[in-house]
Amino acid sequence: RNPTPNYNLALDGGYPVVIAEKGYGTVMANFAKRKAEGKGAEIISMTGGLATNQIPSASVATLITDKPAELVASLQKAGADYAKRNGGNFEISAKADGKDVKLTVTGVSAHSSEPESGVNPVARMLDFINSLDGKVALKHNHITDAARYAADNGRLDYLGNKLNVGFSDAFMGP
């Protein structure tokens, strides 16, 4: 007879037997849509990811402006500087489409059980947007509110240490 192994049940597993799977947590923060205030470009939408247990490969924000070429140049420069300061293992690009500017952060997709194997573009998009304050003229709205909240409450810390919810044990690790 073998000793009983350490295990847990993973109800979302597609396999007949799952020895263990790291869980994940979700912080749900809601920001009331509000009219943009101030001068500059306005972020009108932001996307990233299809499932809560997935680190997506890209996050896209759409901005509107009267000066798309100028905004693209500013975002490209700020994006290159931001990527260099934050590990350089992701890319930030901006492209004009009429008066719209598509801002894309490309990271590395991963399952949430192994966040260290991915590069979360949503976290980087929010942190990047927040870092633009004073460098690139952006109107403040619910999306910039969300970016500030994310920067203040976790930034790029995927282990939850800044929120005081970080956990680790010998069997599962962090």
Language model segments and positions:
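Midchain, well-structured core segments that form catalytic/ion-binding scaffolds
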Residues: 2-174
